[in-house]
Amino acid sequence: MGCWGRNRGRLLCMLLLTFMFMVLEVVVSRVTASLAMLSDSFHMLSDVLALVVALVAERFARRTHATQKNTFGWIRAEVMGALVNAIFLTGLCFAILLEAVERFIEPHEMQQPLVVLSVGVAGLLVNVLGLCLFHHHSGEGQGAGHGHSHGHGHGHLAKGARKAGRAGVEAGAPPGRAPDQEETNTLVANTSNSNGLKADQAEPEKLRSDDPVDVQVNGNLIQESDNLEAEDNRAGQLNMRGVFLHVLGDALGSVIVVVNALVFYFNWKGCTEDDFCTNPCFPDPCKSSVEIINSTQAPMRDAGPCWVLYLDPTLCIIMVCILLYTTYPLLKESALILLQTVPKQIDIKHLVKELRDVDGVEEVHELHVWQLAGSRIIATAHIKCEDPASYMQVAKTIKDVFHNHGIHATTIQPEFASVGSKSSVLPCELACRTQCALKQCCGTRPQVHSGKDAEKAPTVSISCLELSENLEKKARRTKAEGSLPAVVIEIKNVPNKQPESSL
């Protein structure tokens, strides 16, 4: 609640200041005919929308409890808010870029630069205040690596296993380690796991009530109040970074307004109503009447210098480049999280190799690693083992492998080799039905016969034991026999002869 309260207060304060200043810029831009300030007011409007999105995302992200329709809660609301903010800012950059190109084609002269300067300084002060409020979110990325960035507590942590509500075993992290080592995550639901095994009672000091405990329900991590603030802060970094980038863009816009107003005020010599001059920076002179051009009462002069008029669009293009450079990482990161790609710090090939090197593991398939939000990385895998007796020890080793890669929420689906089966022949013991085989699971494709083969192939139901025996015999055949023929099961229909009856 502390982190949410601070973020909410900062967002509300910045929202009020931004909205008030946006109204002020719209009024001043109309009075001074300053298109630069009008574009900056539109930037402020986008910031108002961004702050509203951030507030809504922060509000929804507090609802971490699982529901029947949303088993992970609303933990990804802030990631979605970060993506929306990045898209708003990117669209704004292209709008400013188009306006800057138009300014190069048709330069505009600023009216009342002192008023524009005053409003620009006030806007800069407002944005400096916003940068002070959100500067902690300026450079903190998500999932930057493993180590002390998991949001889990130090000290003694209780062992336990999550109560399985579906097929598979939810593996937690290893027991608590020393403070100088990696932090751990425990998945505690009750005192027994899905196999009815009691929790370790040998070290009762690990179950102290003052120790930080993490509880995972339906894949949603729920922490005690000691660690909730730190984890929520990390989970909302993308959203708050989006707000920071908007405030930074406003600050750059205010700097551009101030610099442009100062340069224009001290360097531009424009034409006034009582002055006789021409403006070579425009296609037509600013005083185009014949009386002024033919007048000999005062010498003619030129307005300028013209480079002052091109300073504003040049600075706008520089601002667009800076904003795009700072927004692209946020846009890319939030989009990749929502696309459930493998986090960049996870080497999936090395992870698969380590899992296959574990003693007792025959095959690893259907491995999926993705990032929920912040530092919460989730993995699921099908692990084929030799026998059920050694599975628990294998699961603990697999859990340690995942933990070493920074993955603390893992779901393992165990598979045990059938009698006489080989891993190379049957890579998946729990293959899907033919309806879903092409979509997910082990990707097994049913054999499809075409042409005359389809007519000759009879539909026969055989047991799994018979199928394994046939496959074993098939694998033992030598290469001298040529191509391996398909297993043909012939069914001969012997007609039942009726016994002849004699009278």
Curated annotation (Swiss-Prot):
It is a multi-pass membrane protein. GO terms for molecular function: calcium channel inhibitor activity; metal ion binding; zinc ion transmembrane transporter activity; zinc:proton antiporter activity. GO terms for biological process: cadmium ion transmembrane transport; calcium ion import; defense response to bacterium; detoxification of cadmium ion; in utero embryonic development; intracellular calcium ion homeostasis; intracellular zinc ion homeostasis; negative regulation of calcium ion import. Residues 147-165 have a biased composition (Basic residues). Zn(2+) binds at residues 43, 47, 246, 250. PANTHER family: FI23527P1, PROTON-COUPLED ZINC ANTIPORTER SLC30A1. This is Proton-coupled zinc antiporter SLC30A1. It comes from Mus musculus. The gene is Slc30a1.
